[in-house]
From Swiss-Prot:
SUPFAM superfamilies: P-loop containing nucleoside triphosphate hydrolases (SSF52540), RecA protein, C-terminal domain (SSF54752). One of its GO terms (cellular component) is cytosol. The keyword DNA-binding applies. It is found in: Cytoplasm. Can catalyze the hydrolysis of ATP in the presence of single-stranded DNA, the ATP-dependent uptake of single-stranded DNA by duplex DNA, and the ATP-dependent hybridization of homologous single-stranded DNAs. It interacts with LexA causing its activation and leading to its autocatalytic cleavage. It holds the Pfam family RecA_C. It comes from Rhodococcus jostii (strain RHA1). This is Protein RecA.
Length: 347
């Protein structure tokens, strides 16, 4: 047995040497050889969602799918991720296939609209080709495609109304994702695909809901987020926002099926302060007695809205609560580029 093992080791060494010669050093390596770096992430803007994702945000160099019903907060979640990437000095691009991006709203969420790269392509092929070229440049930190449903194949645009184009969009997405995934990993770019829901006809058992663009995106996505509006927030009789639930239905970088709930306020986006209050109460840092919220003996306010306003005005207390929650849960976000000499940025 020993001579055979020696021969196998020798044959493997020869094969590895030949591979290194043909394809460059490091083309094949043993998994335990290098020091494994923690997965770099981009925060989502909601501490509850960062915790549900298990690593503190959306993973870099991966495909992320955000889907849900209309007006559930899909684009808002994506824009908050863009704002956080830009805040750390990153470059962001937005492929607006729906031609519906509101620059004023994006600005209110913290997006640097002057620096944001925007494309409003005519066809699905053009949109995905632009996305692929931007990713391969290696300069991008985050790219958002809004939405997959709006990526209309050229043949469909040039054809007549009523023409059948079965499977064109699915084939387009499958080809694009095959090309993109390797480039995403090499460049450390996070690609967010926003998707819409459709209903399958004739489904008797199970959910009839499905997403557009075929099955390729489901397979290539490292993270899939199901965004749902569960409640309307009111100030008296006026609707001021939505209570949103996000379920992590797929997660390749941490345990899946966790849920997060947070408030999205109209015109303001995800309420960071609201998320901190919810998480603070859950983990015992903030005490709720009746309708009053207190932190270390100091009253934050009566009712969640007053407590939110207090934290908005007193950023030092807000930052202190956030730090304690993140320390307890062991999450911290590194949104820097995936390079050896880059210093990590702690959030």
């Amino acid at each position: 047995m020993a001579p055979q093992a020696h021969d196998r080791d020798k044959a493997l060494d020869l094969a590895l040497a030949q591979i290194d010669k043909n394809f460059g050093k490091g083309s094949v390596m043993r998994l335990g050889e290098g020091v494994r770096q923690p997965i770099a992430v981009i925060p989502t803007g909601s501490i509850a969602l960062d915790v549900a994702l298990g690593i503190g945000g959306l993973p870099r160099g991966r495909v992320v799918e955000i889907y849900g019903p209309e007006s559930s907060g899909k684009t808002t979640v994506a824009l908050h991720a863009v704002a956080n990437a830009q805040a750390a000095g990153g470059i962001a691009a937005f492929i607006d296939a729906e031609h519906a991006l509101d620059p004023d709203y994006a600005q209110k969420l913290g997006v640097d609209t002057d620096a944001l790269l925007v494309s409003q392509p005519d066809t699905g092929e053009q949109a995905l080709e632009i996305a692929d070229m931007l990713i391969r440049s290696g300069a991008l930190d985050i790219l958002v495609v809004d939405s997959v449903a709006a990526l209309v194949p050229r043949a469909e645009i040039e054809g007549e109304m009523g023409d059948s184009h079965v499977g064109l969009q699915a084939r387009l997405m499958s080809q694009a994702l095959r090309k993109m995934t390797g480039a995403l990993s090499n460049s450390g770019t996070t690609a967010i695909f926003i998707n819409q829901l459709r209903e399958k006809i004739g489904v008797m058992f199970g959910s009839p809901e499905t997403t557009t663009g075929g099955k390729a995106l489901k397979f290539y996505s490292s993270v899939r987020l199901d965004v749902r509006r569960i409640e309307t927030l009111k100030d008296g009789t006026d609707a001021v926002g939505n209570r949103t639930r996000v379920k992590v239905v797929k997660n390749k970088v941490a345990p899946p099926f966790k849920q997060a709930e947070f408030d999205i306020l109209y015109g303001l986006g995800i309420s960071k302060e609201g998320s901190l209050i919810d998480m603070g109460v859950e983990h015992g840092f903030i005490r709720k007695s009746g309708s009053w919220y207190t932190y270390e003996g100091d009253q934050l306010g009566q009712g969640k809205e007053n407590a939110r306003k207090f934290l908005l005005e007193n950023t030092d207390i807000r930052d202190e609560i956030e730090k304690k929650i993140k320390e307890k849960l062991g999450i911290g976000a590194d949104v820097t580029a995936a390079t050896d000499d880059a210093a990590p940025v702690e959030f």
